[in-house]
């Protein structure tokens, strides 16, 4: 079968594609904001259809950006949920099947996201993003396990919940 595009028409298409795609090469990368809140249900924000709660700023960010419509985790605890969100893996595949201390005893005290797991923050940082986290980390409190060791440039928060054991 004979090719229906001649050389001049191919050149025109290539030049057109070049000028259409060129601005994309210089476009600023998008900002990435992830909001993860304990005990916030799927329909508890205006942008997800709640008829009473008013969340205008979050609704605006959702309208101008991307909403997660199918994220869920098979563990009903906060640490495994965070691990799944940050690694893109099931909690049991990255070793985070329960919450670390204070209520889990010595085994849970030592629990942290394995260093071999790559986090979303590490990927974004390697792409030139400045990264930060505010709030409860809950993925380990030992050296090498804190947010600033796992790809976040800045961190303001606590390693566990507000019922942590006193430091001895």
Pin down the residues of each PLM region.
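Intrinsic disorder/low-complexity signature
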Residues: 1-3, 23, 28
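N-terminal secretory signal peptides that target proteins for export/translocation
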Residues: 1-11
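Bacterial N-terminal signal peptides
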Residues: 13-23
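Formylglycine-dependent sulfatase
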Residues: 25-168
């Amino acid at each position: 079968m004979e090719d229906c595009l001649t050389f001049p028409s191919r050149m025109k298409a290539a030049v057109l594609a070049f000028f259409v795609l060129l601005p994309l090469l210089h476009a600023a990368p998008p900002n990435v904001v992830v909001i993860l809140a304990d005990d916030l249900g799927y329909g508890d924000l205006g942008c997800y259809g709640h008829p009473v709660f008013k969340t205008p700023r979050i609704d605006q960010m959702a309208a101008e950006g991307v909403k997660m419509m199918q994220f869920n985790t098979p563990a009903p605890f906060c640490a495994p949920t965070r691990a799944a969100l940050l690694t893109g893996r099931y909690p049991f595949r990255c070793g985070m099947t329960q919450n670390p201390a204070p209520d889990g005893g010595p085994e849970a005290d030592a629990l942290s996201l394995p260093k071999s797991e790559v986090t979303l923050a590490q990927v974004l940082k390697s792409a030139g993003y400045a990264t930060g986290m505010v709030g409860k980390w809950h993925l380990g409190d030992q050296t090498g396990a804190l947010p600033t060791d796992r790809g976040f440039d800045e961190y303001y928060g606590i390693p566990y919940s507000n019922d942590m054991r006193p430091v001895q």
